[in-house]
Design a protein with these regions (language model features):
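C-terminal catalytic domain of Rieske-type non-heme iron oxygenases
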Residues: 1-222
């Protein structure tokens, strides 16, 4: 498949996200299907939907947006149709709850996604090592009937393995996880070689990191 660099740059996740802190947890909300205000052109609703679905240049669109409907509204309709069997009252929820990325950080190590997203992250220590941890990605799934199926298989990746090896099992999430974690070794090396007395964090977009360190210092002090 041929990558479409134009469609991949439509969204301005860093610009449009909202970050909040509440006691011992933080929340981030990223609106999906909303183009960046800094684009030098105005994308069509079809271009927006194709970007949402990661359409490549040599692929057909997964669906054609009906006239008069926005890509965001259409994506919400598709999501509701998918959820209806498990959530009969899904029409009572707004588009943001079925469309957008809402992710929480519950101090110190649990990161559930909100609304109808099925992803959860958990970080656990590896003995007393300060530069290593276990990152767990937990994907919850609906099941039919009253009997709960057996637990899913626990799959463990080695330090030198890539998330993309799991694409046959978890689909496009393998690419997402790989994209989000491939630079972690470089970040770790940068932190270890950093010569300043403390980190410089942005006031807003790195609110989650600032809040975590604030909570850690509070617990250590007490």
């Amino acid at each position: 498949a041929l990558w479409n660099s134009k469609s991949s740059s439509i969204f301005g996740f860093q610009l449009l996200g909202r970050y909040d802190s509440f006691g011992n947890f933080t929340r981030a909300i990223t609106p999906n299907g909303t183009p960046s205000p800094h684009l030098p052109w105005v994308p069509s609703e079809q271009e927006i939907f194709d970007a949402i679905t990661d359409k490549r240049l040599d692929e057909d669109s997964l669906a054609l947006i009906p006239d008069g409907m926005t890509a965001r509204t259409f994506a919400a309709k598709v999501a509701r149709d998918r959820l209806r069997s498990a959530v009969p009252n899904v029409d009572d929820f707004c588009d943001a709850e079925v469309n957008d990325s809402m992710y929480f950080t519950l101090f110190p190590n649990f990161h559930p996604w909100g609304a109808f997203n099925r992803i959860n992250y958990r970080f656990r220590p590896v003995g007393k090592k300060v530069d290593e941890c276990v990152m767990e990605c937990i994907y919850t799934e609906d099941f039919e009937g009253d009997e709960r199926p057996p637990p899913a298989e626990y799959i463990e990746l080695g330090l030198d393995q890539e998330w993309t090896e799991l694409i046959p099992l978890i689909g496009n999430l393998g690419r997402v996880f790989q994209q989000d974690s491939f630079n972690l070794p470089k970040v770790q090396k940068g932190l270890e070689s950093f010569q300043a007395d403390g980190l410089t964090l942005t006031k807003y977009q790195e609110l989650k990191i600032r809040h975590w360190h604030s909570m850690a210092e509070r617990f250590i002090a007490n």
